[in-house]
Amino acid sequence: MAIKTKRMLSKTKSCSCSMPGVWRAAAYCSGAAVIFHSPRACAHVARSMDISAQYRALANGAAENLKPIPVVSSMLQEKHSIFGGADCLRACIEDVVNTYRPKCLIIANSCVAGVIGDDVEAVGKESEVKYGIPVLTVPCYGFLDGEYYQGYFAVAEQLAERFFHKQTKLENTALLIGDNGGPWGHYAKEVKRLLAYFSIKVIGQFPGYIPINELPQITAASFSIILGGRGQTYNGLTKIARLLEMNYEVPYLQDGYPVGWDNTVDWLRNLGVFLHQEDLAEKAVVQEKDKLFAFADKVKKITQGKRCVVCIGRMLMYFHPAGILETLRRLEMQVEAIILFDNYNTKERKLMVEAVSAQCQAPIIDQTAGQQLLETVDLVLTTHEITNNQDIKQIFLPMLPLVGTSGEIEFMDCIYKTLCRRGEKGGIVYV
């Protein structure tokens, strides 16, 4: 019997709605308001995102007074598909301006608005003149001709163009570019901790987390750091970083994604070269290494010699196995096999096999052959939840892995605690 998993999807291009991306790019920019030119149901998506983001933020230690900006639907109905929804949008804009007194309006377009053919840009320009505030519109319509990140990056670029100005630089300051859970998320907190070795202070995170009236000041940063990963997200954030560099003289730290110890070392040394402080970078590497290996030595009494398998079902552009296998070697665990799920096409499977083979000598087997092996090992690390065996101990490998030394320690701690669980009871742990 083959291994059964949840949500086995494999695609190279995102297929999603652009409207949540529009909202997320301004979610905590106090002074702004977002209008969804959409039926009421579409606004429920943003509301659900808002609730989930609030719970994640509180879990990560954010202040409880965290407040997202207003999101209002223009309440398109069936009749507007015949007569158009422009008047409905105008009425919504007037209501939002009178109710919330925003300093900036951002309009997200739904599929319905795109099918109708409403000229949202014209309504935006008209409203900007009427109310005397910036009104930003985006060139994408729900699922029709864009996706989440197209809306996200469109708003980011327009906020930069409308509000940024050249400023006198503040020494030893940095601007974070991207989201990854916001200022209270693991990525941002870890980057701030590592920057402390160089006495660098973060003055903001763009887009989404800087009040509208403070946007002109953030170009005073000495440089910017991209909170990116791989693929289209990183490419889009890099475009924003280049815009800041070309137009506002804010250079950015290039080529760095501190996932895994080796990449964290590269990131620190790259930062040292960028800042012309190579000596500080080497001191940081030594201190971080001592911290990491001290923790590894502490937990190896449990992890040493334990048998595990790694199950992979993501494409190489989204998931690189090197960091995971590096951690398992550090903990002196025995990798019995690498199981590749059946959702790969021939090209993607070949790329993943090459990446795994370069890091590990364990056999690479398919989904059918791996089922029996799962029942004999101490631990399964997997990119997809395995559903047809409740007795195995699983650790779910996230799409966005934890970064830096703290991320490595947290991952090792998760492995340690999972192996320490008593009895034969299985289950899944999310890092």
Annotate each language-model stretch with its function.
Residues 1-431:
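An N-terminal assembly and electron-transfer interface module characteristic of large anaerobic redox
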